[in-house]
A protein has these predicted regions:
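Structured mid-to-C-terminal alpha-helical surface segments
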Residues: 1-45, 55-61, 65-67, 71-342
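Active-site glycine-centered loops adjacent to acidic/histidine catalytic or metal-binding residues
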Residues: 50
Length: 342
């Protein structure tokens, strides 16, 4: 599924999008369709992040151009270790069969990243990143098989996607810990989505936030929500329709209005009950994963306590407390974002 220059230009003109970004999304849809149809890859992964949100749970509000997936084949580390080489080899061979050239980034315990290069129909070359995370291999609310949004005649079918509440939770953690324009854009779209169960989102946010690398989720605050204007012009504008920010009065006005709205609507996520604070204290102060103080269903509590990501974080905390600085980086607490006045 490779769109021609003429097709890209026609769709881009119709949707007021940049042709090069549009081409990446069409290629991404083609790759995800192949992943979902593959009998080895499909059952072992679940799409998450901005692509899951914008390509599967909205009508391409923002063009997301990378593939972020969790391995979900098994929660047991031994089975994951056994599955990993075959899964990664199958992905590499599938991508090669579609004409992509890979550059593998250094592998880590938590996952691996590939940057795939392709010859663009518009001339020159483009890239697509595929990132596999192996720590979040226990989905909190399950995995759904879904079709993507359609771009002209291009659409993925039957793609494994994380439950929307866990996708949103990941976005909420990214909103605080990364503070990028794309996360702010996605958060603003999320607060307008109907029928979300915010109790489920908060539980997942606590799990993911407590697992965050080098961040103390107890310090998470609506005050950290926002982004820099340069991040919009450098990274977000290319993923939106032409002149998107004009109706808001320009990027600075958009940031001001959207930040205020998100801070107000999302504030309850950062108002921790005594039980939630006890859970976070256990993980971040003592390296104990005990979700008994959380007001969640028993199956969710069990899934949180079994989370490999949380257990890895707890192991690092214990190592740090014992004086072994090799495993755990110092955890930072959220402060006032740079460039923001009191």
């Amino acid at each position: 599924m490779v769109a021609s220059r003429e097709t890209l230009q026609d769709i881009a003109a119709e949707r007021q999008l940049q042709p090069a970004t549009l081409e990446r999304v069409i290629r991404l849809i083609d790759i995800l369709d192949a992943f979902g149809a593959d009998t080895l890859i499909g059952p072992q992964i679940a799409l998450k992040g901005g692509t899951a949100l914008n390509v599967f749970h909205s009508d391409l509000d923002r063009l997301s151009v990378d593939i972020d997936v969790n391995y979900v084949g098994a929660i047991e580390k031994e089975q994951m270790d056994a599955d990993r080489p075959g899964l990664e080899d199958r992905i590499e061979r599938l991508m090669e069969s579609k004409g992509y050239a890979a550059r593998r980034e250094p592998s880590e315990h938590a996952g691996g990243k590939w940057i795939y290069r392709y010859a663009s129909a518009l001339g020159g070359a483009g890239t697509i990143e595929i990132d596999i995370n192996y720590l979040y291999r226990g989905p909190l609310y399950g995995v759904d098989r879904m079709p993507s949004a359609a771009i002209g005649s291009y659409q993925a079918k039957n793609v494994p996607v994380l439950d929307i509440h866990e996708i949103v939770a990941g976005k909420m953690v990214a909103l605080i810990t990364r503070r990028t324009a794309r996360d702010l854009f996605d958060a603003h779209r999320i607060i307008a989505m109907p029928s979300l169960d915010w109790a489920k989102i908060k539980a997942a946010t606590l799990m993911i936030g407590a697992s965050a690398k080098s961040f103390d989720w107890r310090s998470a605050s609506p005050a950290a929500i926002g982004c820099e204007v340069g991040d919009i012009t450098g990274k977000l504008t290319m993923c939106l329709h032409d002149r998107y920010f004009d109706v808001f009065g320009g990027p600075p006005a958009w940031i001001e209005n959207v930040t205020a709205e998100c801070r107000e609507k999302l504030a309850p996520l950062f108002q921790f009950t005594a039980g939630e604070t006890a859970f976070l204290d256990g993980v971040l102060d003592r390296g104990d994963v005990d979700a008994s103080s959380l007001d969640v269903p028993e199956n969710v509590r069990s899934s949180i306590e079994a989370s490999p990501a949380l257990r890895w974080k707890a192991q690092n905390v214990k190592a740090w407390k014992s004086g072994d600085k090799s495993l755990a980086p110092r955890t930072r607490r959220a402060g006032r974002p740079r460039g923001e006045t009191r």
